[in-house]
Amino acid sequence: MPVLHNRISNEELKARMLAETEPRTTVSFYKYFTIDDPKAFRDRLYIQLEQCKVLGRIYIATEGINAQISVPNNQFDAFKAVLFSAHPALDQIRLNIALEDDGKSFWVLRMKVRERIVADGIDDPTFNPANVGQYLKADQVNAMADDPDTVFVDMRNHYEYEVGHFENALEVPSDTFREQLPMAVEMLDEARDKNIVMYCTGGIRCEKASAYMLHHGFKNVYHVEGGIIEYARQAKAQGLPLKFIGKNFVFDERMGERISDDVIAHCHQCGASCDSHTNCRNEGCHLLFIQCPTCAAKYEGCCSTQCLDEMKLPLEEQRAIRSGRENGMKIFNKSKGLLQSTLHIPAPEVKDKAE
């Protein structure tokens, strides 16, 4: 029986990926549909995708599939054939192709079965995730962006919104999607007579959010088809003005795709104009934060002098310091509270309600 998971170290896998000469394409896709046996579906698809040399992260649940992957260009047609034939619901599924891509976004294939493909915290048997808002293409998005009776709602996390968003979009300030959903209902309560446009990176969160808003009695609910990635692709292909400003945060090694030339964020250490995310180099921290080149050199990639000092200690001393706090300091830590307390960044002023 084939091995259905990776057994090679991350270091070796990353070295192999960097040594590849065949160009790769970074792709994301999702689909809400019923999978009766997620584990069997996962195992079957894993074998086929591994043969196509696919790398990346795929979540599978009874409610569907969510994937961010990279595919060798010479295997792309084979990959599409595998995916489109994996289930009738996946035939001709839309693939979001990365806008900025060197093909080095992933170095291992990880496929996991989860309870949900996006953690929403919804525990209401009357909720119908199939009853979603209306899709909007790029030209429709632009028209609604200029409409004073329309509210754009960003259904991404604080660190995503910080580096890029649609003009005048409402931020729902939270670390998690499950917290955002009820917050969005409360914040938009006085805007029930307006058009509500939900958006996210690739469409998976805003599609479910649109269903959640309809479930809570909102009538004119829309969501951006394919999220920011597809909007930017359509807008650029059609020569439309970009209503999204800044950078689109992505969950791979790139950490962002440039959408417009605007840099709307600032270095979390010195305040210089910057929108480049990084993880603190201290193995006991890995805080996600924005760091300019000057501060990267000054702090050697760390988020603070404390982490810099700790990183220079002998390994045994580092491990002793980290002991007992590992569970709270996982790699790719994205907590807004931790960011504010570590770097002494004040919480931004956020509107309580949509105007």
Curated annotation (Swiss-Prot):
EC number: 1.14.-.-
SMART domains xrefs: RHOD
Cited SUPFAM superfamilies: Rhodanese/Cell cycle control phosphatase
Transmembrane segments: none
Annotated Pfam families: Rhodanese, Rhodanese_C, UPF0176_N
Entry keyword annotation includes NADP: no
Lineage: superkingdom: Bacteria
UniProt-annotated catalytic positions: C200
Start and end residues of each Rhodanese domain: 146-240
Substrates-to-products reaction catalysed: uridine(34) in tRNA + AH2 + O2 = 5-hydroxyuridine(34) in tRNA + A + H2O
Listed CDD domains: RHOD_YceA
Any one of the GO BP annotations: tRNA modification
InterPro entries reported in the protein's UniProt record: Rhodanese-like_dom (IPR001763), Rhodanese-like_dom_sf (IPR036873), Rhodanese_C (IPR022111), TrhO (IPR020936), TRHO_N (IPR040503)
GO MF entries: oxidoreductase activity, acting on paired donors, with incorporation or reduction of molecular oxygen
Keyword list, A-Z: Oxidoreductase, tRNA processing
Protein family (similarity comment): Belongs to the TrhO family.
Biological role: Catalyzes oxygen-dependent 5-hydroxyuridine (ho5U) modification at position 34 in tRNAs.
Protein name: tRNA uridine(34) hydroxylase
Originating organism: Pectobacterium carotovorum subsp. carotovorum (strain PC1)
Primary gene name: trhO
